[in-house]
Amino acid sequence: MEPCVLIKIMGFFKNRTARLFNESLMKAEQGIPEFQVIVADMFREGAGTVSDNQKAIYWYEEASNNGNTEATYKLGVAYFRGDGVDEDIDKGIEYVERAAKDGYKMATKTLPTMKAFKQHQKLVKKE
């Protein structure tokens, strides 16, 4: 494939992604939690907009406060890793526990590993 064709294709997708971001942002601002998660993901990845972890966290918090368990899980992971926020393993586990309690399957799968990591950290500090 010709390089100029690839550039045109990449430009096409970049424009579509930016439009998708703007449309999703309008719906997120209306308080629709599913779009709040999409906007948060796009900020986190820099898809259709500039990457901004703090804005991603803001939108995950909004979606979580609006009852979206995926956002609650992603907030927990962010706090656990210190991704866009100060690392707080306990707070991360709290969010993931809440998402697991609300039936989010990925949270149920991730939670034991997070708790094991926390226990490992405690043991290492004792040494």
Which residues does each PLM region occupy?
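TPR/TPR-like (Sel1-like) alpha-helical repeat modules
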Residues: 87-105, 112
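Short helix-capping/linker turns of helical repeat alpha-solenoids
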Residues: 29-32, 45-47, 52, 65-68, ...
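Terminal, low-structured helical/coil segments at or just beyond the last alpha-helical repeat
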Residues: 12, 106-127
